[in-house]
């Protein structure tokens, strides 16, 4: 997908509102979308994913970007986290951004300390390693960086979980029954 400059500006504005972390990010986004009703479904999905990418990877992105402004954090998240190429976001970049974005593309994340790579506070990573192991602490950090799965509850008065699972799979969704709930589906 090629984000438009308007989508990039809206994502930057939403990140700017979410970064102070005065309210839960989903509440900030809900308010942002209610005041920006002209945004379409695709725009909203892009903005939400970008905001949550910035928040999940905040420590890493701040390490990679000198003077981390919301605009730079959005660009860094798109390049390093979401895998966008510079060509996909070049209409949003200023001429002064060329050097740091090129350096960002080649930045060696593996050379950074594990806590920074995983966007965890040092004290938390050290405590996880002390209480478990470095491997388990890394697995925990990686899990925290992933997008959460969507769990749905089937209304058993109107549908059967097995049939809903088959319908979702037939529609191309990777759906599975939940482990603990007999009426849940994880997408």
Residues covered by each model-derived region:
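Class I Rossmann-like S-adenosyl-L-methionine
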Residues: 1-187
């Amino acid at each position: 997908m090629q984000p438009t400059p308007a989508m990039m500006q809206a994502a930057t504005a939403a990140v700017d509102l979410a970064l102070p972390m005065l309210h839960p990010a989903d509440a900030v986004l809900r308010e942002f979308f209610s005041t920006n009703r002209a945004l379409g479904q695709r725009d909203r999905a892009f903005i939400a994913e970008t905001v949550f990418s910035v928040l999940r990877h905040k420590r890493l992105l701040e390490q990679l970007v000198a003077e981390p402004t919301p605009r730079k954090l959005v660009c860094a998240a798109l390049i390093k986290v979401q895998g966008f190429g510079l060509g996909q976001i070049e209409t949003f970049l200023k001429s002064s951004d060329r050097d740091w974005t090129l350096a960002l593309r080649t930045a060696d994340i593996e050379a950074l300390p594990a806590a920074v790579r995983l966007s965890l506070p040092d004290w938390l990573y050290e405590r996880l390693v002390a209480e478990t192991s470095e491997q388990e602490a890394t697995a925990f950090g990686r899990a925290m960086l992933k997008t959460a799965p969507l769990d749905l509850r089937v209304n058993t008065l109107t549908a059967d979980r097995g049939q809903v699972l088959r319908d979702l799979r037939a529609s191309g969704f990777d759906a599975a029954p939940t482990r603990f709930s007999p009426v849940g589906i994880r997408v």
